[in-house]
């Protein structure tokens, strides 16, 4: 007779085998089959069943089936709370928040992000801290709550700096995100300082030719464009486009946005000169 542990290993092995050969459109059926089998062989009060439901949610999410993923993550979260597993509850809250965020359910997503953040802080587990703070900042920015966005982005910078040091990609990402928020609130001096910081860190970490370096240059171009410093803006647009085009196609949305901004700047400079 197989033990529960052995059955679980067989289930997971079979799932992974199917995923490796399946197409994305087959993931929904794979997840359903896996979960149905898990419900048959595992006790309803088994923590492994909670794991199985979470894995099914992961499969749906990987296939872009966000509604189905949300259903699974909710179910798994409810069970993890019943078991009193703080790590699982924190992890599932974060997963559910991300899926709801992508589904446009910002209000509910914010609650689950904050729940996950609180649990990770209580456990003194900082592995997801900066990521969650950045996600909360982005969500609040999207809601137009710029005060909350600034608060979360500032905390993300502090956490990233404390965990990784001042010259780390995570610290640069947090500085970049806060800088973008300041562009939207037209606080261009703060935005300039943060994007310069992000650019300096990224050049140190990656060298001059890297997409994230190009992103920082493009953001600085927008700052100087908005401040009326057209010569600096032009230099950063040119640098950003040169770097981006080494890694992206011309029809890439980010490249097209930078190109459109650069074209608008050139038109403005022509008018100013005439």
Where are these regions (language model features)?
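Conserved alpha-helical positions within TPR/SEL1-like repeat arrays
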Residues: 9, 13-19, 47-62, 87-102, ...
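Terminal, low-structured helical/coil segments at or just beyond the last alpha-helical repeat
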Residues: 246-274
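TPR-adjacent "capping" and linker segments in tetratricopeptide-repeat scaffold/adaptor proteins
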Residues: 1-9, 42
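Amphipathic alpha-helices of TPR/Sel1-like and other helical repeat/solenoid scaffolds
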Residues: 14, 26-41, 75-78
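Short coil/turn linkers that connect adjacent helices within long alpha-helical scaffolds
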Residues: 21, 40-44, 79-85, 121-125, ...
């Amino acid at each position: 007779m197989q033990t529960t542990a052995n059955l679980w290993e067989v289930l997971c092995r079979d799932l992974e085998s199917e995923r490796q050969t399946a197409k994305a459109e087959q993931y929904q059926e794979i997840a359903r089959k896996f979960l149905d089998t898990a419900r048959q062989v595992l006790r309803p009060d088994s923590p492994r069943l909670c794991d199985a439901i979470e894995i099914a949610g992961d499969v749906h999410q990987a296939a872009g089936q966000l509604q189905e993923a949300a259903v699974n993550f909710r179910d798994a979260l409810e069970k993890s709370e019943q078991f009193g597993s703080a790590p699982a509850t924190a992890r599932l809250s974060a997963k559910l928040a991300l899926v709801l965020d992508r589904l446009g359910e910002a209000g509910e997503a914010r609650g689950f992000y904050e729940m996950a953040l609180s649990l990770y802080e209580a456990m003194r587990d900082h592995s997801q801290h900066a990521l969650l703070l950045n996600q909360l900042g982005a969500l609040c920015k999207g809601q137009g709550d710029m005060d909350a966005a600034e608060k979360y982005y500032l905390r993300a910078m502090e956490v990233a700096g404390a965990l990784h040091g001042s010259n780390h990609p995570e610290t640069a990402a947090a500085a970049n995100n806060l800088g973008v928020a300041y562009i939207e609130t037209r606080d261009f001096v703060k935005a300039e300082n943060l994007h310069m910081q992000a650019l300096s860190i990224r050049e140190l970490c990656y060298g001059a030719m890297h997409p994230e370096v190009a992103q920082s240059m493009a953001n600085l171009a927008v700052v100087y464009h908005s401040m009326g410093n057209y010569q600096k803006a032009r230099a950063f647009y040119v640098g950003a486009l040169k770097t981006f085009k080494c890694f992206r196609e011309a029809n890439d949305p980010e490249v097209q946005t930078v190109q459109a901004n650069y074209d608008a700047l050139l038109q403005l400079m022509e008018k100013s000169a005439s």
